[in-house]
Amino acid sequence: MFFNSLLTNFAALEVGQHLYWQIGNIRLHGQVFLTSWILLGALLVFISLGTKKMENDPKGLQNLLEFLWDYIRDLARTQIGEKVYRDWMPFIGTLFLFVFVSNWGGALIPWRLIKLPSGELGAPTADINTTIALALLVSLSYFYAGLSNKGWRYFEYYVHPTPIMLPFKILEDFTKPLSLSFRLFGNILADELVVGVLVFLVPLILPIPVMFLGLFTSAIQALIFATLAAYYIGEAVEEHH
Amino acid sequence: MLAFNFFGATEGGLFDINATLPLMAIQVVALTYILNSLFFKPVGKVVEKREKFVSDNIIEAKNKLSEVKKLEADLLTQLQSARTEAQRIVSEAENESDKLYKEALELANNEANASKEKARLEIESQTSAARDQLSKQADDLSELIVNRLILEK
């Protein structure tokens, strides 16, 4: 009885339902694009405001943006290495900012108040398409980084300490995007679900610590995603001696 | 397409993969270019300019500090040599004045001795002259007395 009602209530949380957009033959998850456009628009407005008048003595927003820039540079530099981190810093930074803004936007903005005909708005990173897209971009990036930096010698990496490693290294090329995408997707979706269920069951006070935990998880996941992406690129461009 | 029902969703589900994936990838790539020109490049330019400014200033300050230290050491040695020079001059002057004093003293002593000697000689000669005159007068007187006594007889 109780379980049944819980199930229907879960259905009220609309897990796994999407707002479909049909363009010709292709179908899109509209809610993902809607939230991502809103959040990325906010991010771009924020960044253009902060970089509008750059001064040598930073004031206000410029301070924050410079801190962010420095943070991303440190991340890229420690993972990728002094030599090529400059080429990859924008990509790593974009991954970090995109994931961070998506996660926090999904957690902080009460999207639930906006009613959609089907599905509901939420963090774009809680959709498997987004995370797989990001993970595949990372895979392409590290292949490109390795090949453009070392040419065919990139494949030495696969037999690096011994040729015995070959199958494992090939397997890694599949597990890397898989783990990247599912880690992010799982964490953000789980957080949304937990908060959703708690809000549904106990609307007062109790969800608040879980929401804070969710914010923490969101930030950590963004950091993990960017760090791992940078680490994979760094691994690909690293010179073996 | 991988899709299965989850909690009674009629279509789609959690693992509904469709064209959202490539479009999202294109969106992220576009975002990378936009953020690069809007955020990473301009902020990087400002930050690196400032870092260069700061490090240049630090290097300059270090150079100036070492220069100052060199000059200080230079001045110290100069001061030292000036001090010894001054000491040398002072002692030389002291010796000189000592010598001059001794010379002057000797000269004065000699002069004094000479004039003393001269005075003594003069006194002596005057004394002998006086004595001669006195004995001559005594002779004359005695002759006069003798002549008178002889004449009265």
From Swiss-Prot, chain A:
GO terms for molecular function: proton-transporting ATP synthase activity, rotational mechanism. One of its GO terms (cellular component) is plasma membrane-derived thylakoid membrane. It holds the Pfam family ATP-synt_A. CDD domains: ATP-synt_Fo_a_6. InterPro entries: ATP_syn_F0_a_bact/chloroplast, ATP_synth_F0_asu, ATP_synth_F0_asu_AS, F0_ATP_A_sf. It is found in: Cellular thylakoid membrane. It is a multi-pass membrane protein. Keywords: ATP synthesis, CF(0), Hydrogen ion transport, Ion transport, Membrane, Thylakoid, Transmembrane, Transmembrane helix, Transport. The chain crosses the membrane at residues 30-50, 91-111, 128-148, 193-213, 214-234. PANTHER family: ATP SYNTHASE SUBUNIT A, CHLOROPLASTIC. Key component of the proton channel; it plays a direct role in the translocation of protons across the membrane. F-type ATPases have 2 components, CF(1) - the catalytic core - and CF(0) - the membrane proton channel. CF(1) has five subunits: alpha(3), beta(3), gamma(1), delta(1), epsilon(1). CF(0) has four main subunits: a, b, b' and c. Belongs to the ATPase A chain family. This is ATP synthase subunit a. It comes from Prochlorococcus marinus (strain MIT 9301).
